[in-house]
């Protein structure tokens, strides 16, 4: 073992002074740093030292010291191999730690040789080791569980031998100190230390991890009825809105407790208010006002209103009755009017308004409606009740036989004909194209055979349409169509027009209907000896086979003409060659002996070589030429492609690429674009080169004749006529009032003189207007205007119609052209003695003054006989009138009015005035007295009262105006004493000094206590205020509220809820 471990280790006992400044004495040695702890210190030693004060040299050659609360210690070079002969010391010193927990993360050392030991305390000594580790713990999966040492210091010693090494170890650590230092708990909370944590126990009213949150007791909104919540610590206070109280403003203060409503009004408590429901007849906030039911002037027809409690009485003038004088006496109750007449009640009279057909004062007379001869045109009048009936002559109708029967009403005219009514008949004015009595016949416009050149005529309404034979056109098919106009003949052909056709005279070399075909001159095979014939325009070209020549290849070429045979050989001509018959046998065809020039194969492109003397001859394959067959024969040289076709030369042939509109090997065939029949609607197709042309039938146009020419496009129809397009034509449907092919002629509707009874006809488009003479109306002035139709005669007058006028026959009592004036029978002043004349229909009524009667008020009466004076008044006749002498308290013509003595508002200080007969009574408010409530009075002292100290007095009136009662102080009541005698008296029965006094007489007669009180109107709530004037013994209101001085006291009808308590 290491020598330094064999040394005797001396434990140093260091006395540590607890408190602040443990490091003040600088106890740490060898350059170590002092760190304050809890009542102690820790020296952070440099490597190689340990001990409480780092005063021991360890001699270790590796290791280190750690002072953080959490960390790790590794073997040297970890995770690489550690060193042999390692003596490592690790010190773990953590300030304020109470325990340190170690966890072995990795451990691989030589078994039994390389060992880690650990212990606690400031000095490392293997003899004091708590445990040790060695071996391949990680590999063997036997790493020990984490272990904890108590205290703030621990050490590890790692020693190795001199041979096998390994990767070593890694040990992590964490410490747990006093987490309540410093104490983070707020607001007086208690801190509980946990493992690496703490917990705060909050006092009531606080929450949060550190009890830093004041619980808002207002969050639950506890205050009711709009109260404002003020949060406190572990509680809250509610500030109530006016009208509520209670801890949570849950109580609605009863403002009705003081009985504020007067005159029997019912108090309804509200929030911070009350509302009085008044008895009928009263109003005001407190029902203090008697409603004046006369304010709305309910009495009608001059009646006088007398106000009462919740009602009124109407004093009616003569001639009217009813609660409100609303009823006029009904003179019509006897039903005087006859024959359905309506009775109109007047004041003391009536008037009959007769039913139609009746007249007279009582409607007894039947009016003769035939008197005015109302029936016209010979009609016979038959009188009835309120009417008549006209028996008309034949041909007339209507109430007055004024209407000529309209035979056009059916209507009889057909096909748009206009019917003109006559007397017992009619005339039809037919629309263009129709005739007949009722316009029932369609006029046949084809009857005159207007269509020419064999065309078919199709009759229409007011017109016709010609369907032309082939080759003709025009409205009447009068025009021969020029089929040459479209120039159908091609290639210079001359066109000759025919009926519905044409003939083309073709130029040389062309043929066909339109000279569209190039004539094939090769068709007769003119070329001889196997030559090829190539057709051209108006000709051909022969391409000869070898050995022939000539226009038709009719000549065999004489190849012997050049004397090819030598050495006396005889030349025999052949087709495209020759044969030499030699004088002597030779090896060549030309009888010479020569080298074989064919040996070098001079003939190209498959040509066959024939050796000749001093040369060779190549027989070329078709399509090649030249000495050596090196030239591709140009088959296009003869221009074989016709009609502009493009010739492309090939070997022994060619290809023609034709221009549009041509086809065939030599482009000699023109394509017939008409083969698909592109022309529509009978159009004739003319083939063109690469196109066609349509010669359209009359009435059609466009490239393929697909469009029907709109002959309406030029708007030929005049005056609003509607154009209907047809094939090669149109038809105008004229607007009413016009006629003609193009609607150019306006129809004269006045020609038939339709206007009757002298009316002037004014011609218009499709009609006419009759300007009638005065007195007539209607479309043709056929109707005599009934000037009576507007009922111009008023007031029951009978109207008789005349020509351009009328006559009114008035009922009795009316006059004027329209019976509009009621004859004024009062104009002669028939009523006597001041009577008022009321004009009626055909009569009058006199409204007599009192005490007169008769038709003309000529009869004098006893005015007092009807006892008009009311309420005990005396009636005095004065001429024909009377005067009522009223008793006091009444007024009016008949003393019917109870004088309202309250009208002058005599009651003062809010007193309620109650009207009486010839007088009034004031119902004073509490605190006021006197006839008019003009004096300040006393409260009604009877009953039980409590003052602010809960002293009690019970007061009772006596017949002398004095008051007697029992008085007890709060102390006396609390101790159960008997009540002393109390005498309460007014200073004057006349209320000239509104004060009162209490005299308390004790049973033992020892002494008295007395005071005087002043009534302060009771404030509407019966509240008394008393002033103490002398105190002979200390037994009143808590020693005069603890002052022994003169003072004021407040008395109410209820015991005080809060009062000063007596001293113990």
UniProtKB/Swiss-Prot annotation:
Residues 62-175 form the CUB domain. Glycans are attached at residues 30, 136, 851. SUPFAM superfamilies: Avidin/streptavidin, EGF/Laminin, Growth factor receptor domain, Spermadhesin, CUB domain. It is found in: Secreted, Extracellular space; Cytoplasmic vesicle; Secreted, Extracellular space, Extracellular matrix, Hyaline layer; Secreted, Extracellular space, Extracellular matrix, Apical lamina. The keyword Repeat applies. SMART domains: CUB (SM00042), EGF (SM00181), EGF_CA (SM00179). The keyword Cytoplasm does not apply. Residues 20-55, 176-212, 214-250, 252-288, 290-326, 328-364, 366-402, 404-440, 442-478, 480-516, 518-554, 556-592, 594-630, 632-668, 670-706, 708-744, 746-782, 784-820, 822-858, 860-896, 898-934 form the EGF-like domain. Disulfide bonds join 23-34, 28-43, 45-54, 62-88, 180-191, 185-200, 202-211, 218-229, 223-238, 240-249, 256-267, 261-276, 278-287, 294-305, 299-314, 316-325, 332-343, 337-352, 354-363, 370-381, 375-390, 392-401, 408-419, 413-428, 430-439, 446-457, 451-466, 468-477, 484-495, 489-504, 506-515, 522-533, 527-542, 544-553, 560-571, 565-580, 582-591, 598-609, 603-618, 620-629, 636-647, 641-656, 658-667, 674-685, 679-694, 696-705, 712-723, 717-732, 734-743, 750-761, 755-770, 772-781, 788-799, 793-808, 810-819, 826-837, 831-846, 848-857, 864-875, 869-884, 886-895, 902-913, 907-922, 924-933, 939-1015. Its main location: secreted. Residues 1-19 form the signal peptide. GO terms for cellular component: apical lamina of hyaline layer; cytoplasmic vesicle; extracellular region. InterPro entries: Avidin (IPR005469), Avidin-like_CS (IPR017889), Avidin-like_sf (IPR036896), Avidin/str (IPR005468), CUB_dom (IPR000859), EGF-like_Ca-bd_dom (IPR001881), EGF-like_CS (IPR013032), EGF-like_dom (IPR000742). Residues 937-1056 form the Avidin-like domain. Keywords: Calcium, Cytoplasmic vesicle, Disulfide bond, EGF-like domain, Extracellular matrix, Glycoprotein, Repeat, Secreted, Signal. GO terms for molecular function: biotin binding; calcium ion binding. Homotetramer. Forms the apical lamina, a component of the extracellular matrix. This is Fibropellin-1.
């Amino acid at each position: 073992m290491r020598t330094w471990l064999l040394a005797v280790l001396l434990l140093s006992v260091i006395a540590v002074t607890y408190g602040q400044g443990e490091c003040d004495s600088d106890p740490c040695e060898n350059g170590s740093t002092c760190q304050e702890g809890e009542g102690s210190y820790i020296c952070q030693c440099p490597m190689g030292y340990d001990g409480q004060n780092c005063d021991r040299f360890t001699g270790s050659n590796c290791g280190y010291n750690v002072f953080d609360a959490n960390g790790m210690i590794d073997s040297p070079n970890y995770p690489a191999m550690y060193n042999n002969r390692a003596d490592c010391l690790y010190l773990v010193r953590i300030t304020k730690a109470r325990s340190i927990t170690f966890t072995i993360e990795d451990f691989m050392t030589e078994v039994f040789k390389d060992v880690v030991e650990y212990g606690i305390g400031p000095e490392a000594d293997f003899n004091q080791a708590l445990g040790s580790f060695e071996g391949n713990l990680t590999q063997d999966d036997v790493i020990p569980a984490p272990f904890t040492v108590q205290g703030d210091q621990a050490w590890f010693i790692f020693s190795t031998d001199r041979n096998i090494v390994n990767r070593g170890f890694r040990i992590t650590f964490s410490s747990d100190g006093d987490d309540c230092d410093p104490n983070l708990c707020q607001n007086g909370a208690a801190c509980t230390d946990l493992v690496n944590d703490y917990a705060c126990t909050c006092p009531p009213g606080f929450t949060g991890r550190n009890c830093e949150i004041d619980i808002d007791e207002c969050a639950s909104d506890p205050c009711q009825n709009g109260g404002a919540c003020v949060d406190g610590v572990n509680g809250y206070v509610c500030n109530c809105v006016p009208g509520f109280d209670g801890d949570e403003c849950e109580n609605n203060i009863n403002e009705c407790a003081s009985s504020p409503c007067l005159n029997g009004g019912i108090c309804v408590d509200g929030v911070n208010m009350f509302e009085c429901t008044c008895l009928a007849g009263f109003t005001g906030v407190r029902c203090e006002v008697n409603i004046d039911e006369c304010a709305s002037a309910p009495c009608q027809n001059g009646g006088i209103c007398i106000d009462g409690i919740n009602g009124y009485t109407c004093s009616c003038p003569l001639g009217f009755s009813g609660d409100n004088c609303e009823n006029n006496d009904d003179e019509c109750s006897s039903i005087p009017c006859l024959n359905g007449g309506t009775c109109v009640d007047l004041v003391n009279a009536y008037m009959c308004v007769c039913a139609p057909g009746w007249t007279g004062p009582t409607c007894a007379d039947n009016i003769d409606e035939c008197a005015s001869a109302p029936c016209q045109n010979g009609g016979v009048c038959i009188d009835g009740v309120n009417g008549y009936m006209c028996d008309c002559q034949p041909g007339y109708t209507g109430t007055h036989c004024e209407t000529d029967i309209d035979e056009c009403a059916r209507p009889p005219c057909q096909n748009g004909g206009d019917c003109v009514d006559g007397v017992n008949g009619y005339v039809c004015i037919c629309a263009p194209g129709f005739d007949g009595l009722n316009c029932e016949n369609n006029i046949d416009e084809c009857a005159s055979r207007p269509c020419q050149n064999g065309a078919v005529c199709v009759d229409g309404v007011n017109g016709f349409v010609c369907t032309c034979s082939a080759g003709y056109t025009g409205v009447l098919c009068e025009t021969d169509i020029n089929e040459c106009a479209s120039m159908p003949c091609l290639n210079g052909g001359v066109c000759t027009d025919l009926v519905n056709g044409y003939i083309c005279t073709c130029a040389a070399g062309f043929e066909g209907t339109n000279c569209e075909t190039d004539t094939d001159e090769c068709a007769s095979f003119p070329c001889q000896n196997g030559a090829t014939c190539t057709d051209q325009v108006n000709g051909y070209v022969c391409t000869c086979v070898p050995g022939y020549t000539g226009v038709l290849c009719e000549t065999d070429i004489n190849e012997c003409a050049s004397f090819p045979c030598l050495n006396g050989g005889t030349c025999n001509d052949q087709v495209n060659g020759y044969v030499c018959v030699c004088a002597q046998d030779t090896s060549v065809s030309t009888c010479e002996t020569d080298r074989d020039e064919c040996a070098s194969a001079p003939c190209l492109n498959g040509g066959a070589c024939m050796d000749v003397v001093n040369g060779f001859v190549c027989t070329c394959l078709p399509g090649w030429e030249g000495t050596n067959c090196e030239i591709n024969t140009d088959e296009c040289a003869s221009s074989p492609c016709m009609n502009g076709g493009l010739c492309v030369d090939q070997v022994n042939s060619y290809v023609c690429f034709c221009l549009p509109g041509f086809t065939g090997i030599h482009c000699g065939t023109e394509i017939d674009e008409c083969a698909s029949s592109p022309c529509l609607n009978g159009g004739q197709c003319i083939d063109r080169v690469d196109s066609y042309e349509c010669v359209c039938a009359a009435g059609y146009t466009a490239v393929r004749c697909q469009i029907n020419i709109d002959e309406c496009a030029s708007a030929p129809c005049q005056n609003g006529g509607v154009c209907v397009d047809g094939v090669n034509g149109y038809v105008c449907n004229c607007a009413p009032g016009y006629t003609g092919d193009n609607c150019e002629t306006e129809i004269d509707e006045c020609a038939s003189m339709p206007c009757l009874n002298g009316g002037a006809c004014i011609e218009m488009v499709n009609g006419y207007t009759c300007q009638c003479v005065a007195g007539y109306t209607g479309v043709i002035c056929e109707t005599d205007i009934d000037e009576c139709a507007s009922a111009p005669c008023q007031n029951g007058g009978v109207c008789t119609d005349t020509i351009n006028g009328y006559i009114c026959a008035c009922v009795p009592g009316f006059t004027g052209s329209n019976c509009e004036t009621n004859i004024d029978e009062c104009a002669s002043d028939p009523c006597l003695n001041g009577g008022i004349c009321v004009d009626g229909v055909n009569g009058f009524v006199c409204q007599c003054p009192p005490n007169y009667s008769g038709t003309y008020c000529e009869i004098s009466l006893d005015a007092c006989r009807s006892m008009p004076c009311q309420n005990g008044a005396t009636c005095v006749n004065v001429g024909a009138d009377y005067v009522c002498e009223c008793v006091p308290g009444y007024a009016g013509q008949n003393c019917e009015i109870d004088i309202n003595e309250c009208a002058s508002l005599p009651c003062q200080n809010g007193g309620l005035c109650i009207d009486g007969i010839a007088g009034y009574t004031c119902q004073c408010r509490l605190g006021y007295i006197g006839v008019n409530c003009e004096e300040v009075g006393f409260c009604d002292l009877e009953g039980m009262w409590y003052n602010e100290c809960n002293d009690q007095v019970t007061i009772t009136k006596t017949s002398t105006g004095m008051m007697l009662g029992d008085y007890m102080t709060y102390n006396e009541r609390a101790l159960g004493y008997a009540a002393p005698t109390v005498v309460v008296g007014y200073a004057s029965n006349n209320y000239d000094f509104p004060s009162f006094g209490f005299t308390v007489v004790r049973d033992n007669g020892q002494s008295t206590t007395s005071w005087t009180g002043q009534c302060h109107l009771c404030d509407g709530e019966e509240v008394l205020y008393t002033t103490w004037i002398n105190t002979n013994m200390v037994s009143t209101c808590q020693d005069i509220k603890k002052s022994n001085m003169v003072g004021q006291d407040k008395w109410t009808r209820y015991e005080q809820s809060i009062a000063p308590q007596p001293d113990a």
